[in-house]
């Protein structure tokens, strides 16, 4: 029992670390209104097991410490990711087809996580922090930019996780 706990924690720590490294390695592109966070492709791992939820969410929290928005990004980014992945995991109880799960995961990210991040960036970035009535135009532009990059990295995530699953059974990694 103890060996399995150590194994699970080690794997989760490695996944969180990979997320952080992939984010920080391309830091200028990982944060802000126009971002391309390749580490988000790891979010497709929850399709295989709910045990991937914690390391991905933890990776987001740690990576966002280095964001220009700091603790604000830690809060909103972790909230958005954690919520989107948790709802995906819940929906997966009713959906067994892996490709359908991947698509559902993308859709839930786009409608749950990305609006939270777009709101955060609209309110707390640069000159926008002084704008008290919420600027819907800014939000829409930021949301559109995030949407496009998120779809791209999540599709990359499908390709990577499906290829990886052929080599390593991603459902059984934690066993």
Feature locations, PLM:
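Membrane-helix interface "capping/anchor" motifs
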Residues: 46-56, 93-101
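Small-polar-interrupted transmembrane alpha-helices in polytopic inner-membrane proteins
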Residues: 19, 56-64
């Amino acid at each position: 029992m103890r060996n399995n706990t150590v194994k699970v924690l080690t794997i989760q720590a490695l996944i969180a670390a990979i997320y952080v490294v992939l984010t920080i390695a391309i830091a200028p592109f990982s944060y802000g209104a126009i971002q391309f966070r390749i580490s988000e492709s790891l979010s497709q791992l929850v399709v295989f097991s709910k045990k991937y939820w914690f390391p991905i969410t933890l990776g987001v929290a740690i990576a966002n410490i280095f964001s220009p928005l700091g603790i604000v990004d830690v809060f909103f980014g972790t909230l958005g990711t954690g919520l989107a992945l948790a709802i995906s995991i819940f929906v997966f109880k009713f959906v067994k087809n892996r490709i359908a799960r991947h698509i559902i995961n993308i859709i839930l990210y786009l409608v749950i996580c990305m609006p939270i991040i777009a709101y955060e960036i609209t309110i707390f970035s640069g000159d926008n922090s002084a704008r008290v009535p919420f600027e819907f135009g800014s939000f829409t532009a930021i949301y559109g930019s995030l949407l496009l990059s998120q779809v791209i990295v999540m599709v990359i995530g499908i390709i990577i996780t499906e290829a990886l699953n052929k080599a390593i059974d991603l459902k059984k990694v934690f066993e």
